[in-house]
């Protein structure tokens, strides 16, 4: 029987192969981190530990754990937060124009762009349930990866075609390569990664995610990892509001 350690190393190796071929810039960051650790220029802050049947991330200096409990059960709890409701954990990816004829007249007319979509958006607004449920979730955002154990569980639940995966800590993301099979997920969906990005790079990545298949951006569902900083939600909203066609 394959040991836990062997399975983790195999997962890591296949992930590295996947990133080397498909996400070269992220692979450069991971390689740079490895070199810095091996040369002693960077002292690792975190360690991956296997405790009573589950993995956790240990802060080497403080001894604190990121999950501080059964990470498998916690990941299942996170997956239960995800639903198909339009008004829960959702970004609205583009506006719905609902101007009345009177409002248009008072404004002195509308631009050609808005004029072209106004009849369609009016129809959509009048004939759709803005607080109902979605039949499918085609694009989804993971805000905070940690070990990524919740990612495949949520994918099994929603089967999205595109995922934006966000993690600010490169060292923690590297640990997730031992526990989460990104290479398997990539067989079912298109993956966008924002890892250790500054604000400019984050904006660039999110704009790419929003631009491709922009017609699927009406409702963008997301899940925020517990204890993960909420400032990324505001940055995502800023990216949405600065799309070129809004």
Q: Positions of the model-derived regions?
A:
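N-terminal donor/sugar-recognition subdomains of glycan-related enzymes
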Residues: 1-246
